[in-house]
């Protein structure tokens, strides 16, 4: 390598030099587990150098799609109640500054409205506290998921309980709403909740069904149109190649969950950004209790950079677009992480700590260290 200094990303290396260094070695790419060739590594090092130069040229780090913000990530769909604090620590190191946790099905149907009330209290209360103790801002969406809408008595009781949570701090939308099996009871619950979102001036996060996805997505958008809900205030999530064009054509935000076994993979996501551009596209992990990855957004961003997707486009799909739509009701604000509160793990939530016996509390004052630049 030539021109190396201690500054992050301050190096240059040509493909020929890398060929010599890597001769006879087989390396795996940390982003996609594919072969790491000299050409691919050279491109990655070049991207790092370019992004670092852009950051150094903008000391105020204004939100322009370059500099430090190019390395910041919002994961706008992460079921953190199902994850450990190790995941929060790993996400923070990867550049995640904020997560949005949608209310969802826990893997087993709830049998009483009290279970739902406790769950809503958890994701709007303790989970928000827990994330903050590890340097990540936490927001949530509140709603009755379609899978449990088929228990009519439970669904009606839950919908009656929603208003008390829709006004809580950190609630940025209603969701996940939509269809699972596309039954009449799911339709009834969806329509009631759309009207609640209009009443409380909240955006909506839509869950599209795993089965018969295209038909369910089109039906959902038809219902939203019937209720005169503004597409610019609605995120249609779990999209794929079958649904993207129609969702974009109708003016909705189009989100993709990097959940390779059932939803979307990183390579496919990169190809969609290349084909359709970044406008109104959002990348999330949908990490939960299943086989999923809380670092999926960061890994996808790296893969897109390796494939030559521009820094501005990457910034849009992993940060700017999510902030634009989920910041509409004012609960999510970029200043929450640009001027963060102190981290003090001595703090308790209703008498409880995030630590266990023998652990040393982490205490940090506002502001990020000077060497905090993260290249995605």
Regions found by a protein language model. Name each.
Residues 276-294, 314:
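Short acidic/histidine-rich active-site segments
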């Amino acid at each position: 390598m030539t021109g190396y200094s201690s500054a992050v990303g301050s190096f240059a290396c040509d493909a020929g030099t890398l060929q010599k260094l890597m001769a006879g070695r087989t390396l795996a790419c940390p982003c996609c587990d594919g072969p790491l060739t000299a050409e691919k590594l050279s491109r990655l090092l070049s991207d790092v150098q370019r992004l670092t130069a852009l950051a150094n040229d903008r000391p105020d780090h204004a939100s322009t799609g370059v500099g430090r913000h190019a390395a910041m990530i919002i994961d706008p769909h992460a079921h953190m109640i199902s994850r450990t604090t190790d995941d929060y620590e790993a996400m923070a190191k990867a550049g995640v500054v904020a997560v949005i946790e949608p209310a969802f099905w826990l893997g087993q149907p709830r049998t009483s409205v009290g279970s739902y009330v406790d769950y809503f209290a958890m994701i709007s209360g303790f989970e928000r506290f827990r994330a903050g103790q590890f340097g990540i801002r936490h927001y949530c969406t509140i709603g009755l998921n379609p899978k449990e809408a088929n228990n009519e008595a439970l669904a009606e009781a839950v919908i009656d309980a929603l208003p008390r949570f829709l006004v809580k701090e950190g609630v940025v939308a209603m969701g996940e709403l939509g269809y699972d099996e596309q039954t009449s009871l799911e339709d009834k619950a969806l329509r009631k909740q759309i009207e609640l979102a209009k009443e409380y001036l909240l955006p909506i996060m839509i869950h599209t069904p795993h089965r018969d996805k295209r038909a369910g997505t089109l039906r959902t958008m038809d219902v939203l149109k019937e209720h005169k809900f503004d597409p610019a205030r609605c995120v249609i999530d779990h999209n794929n190649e079958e649904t993207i064009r129609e969702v974009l054509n109708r003016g909705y935000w189009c989100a993709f969950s990097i959940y390779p076994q059932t939803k979307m993979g990183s390579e496919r996501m990169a190809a969609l950004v290349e084909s359709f551009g970044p406008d109104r596209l959002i990348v999330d992990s949908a990490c939960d209790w299943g086989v999923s990855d809380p670092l999926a957004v960061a890994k996808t961003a790296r893969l897109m950079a390796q494939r030559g997707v521009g820094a501005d486009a990457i910034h849009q799909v992993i940060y700017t677009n999510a902030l634009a739509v989920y910041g509409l009701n004012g609960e999510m604000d970029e200043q929450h992480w640009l001027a963060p509160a102190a981290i003090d793990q001595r703090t308790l939530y209703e008498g409880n700590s995030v630590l266990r016996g023998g652990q040393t509390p982490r205490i940090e004052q506002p502001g990020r260290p000077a060497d905090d630049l993260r290249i995605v």
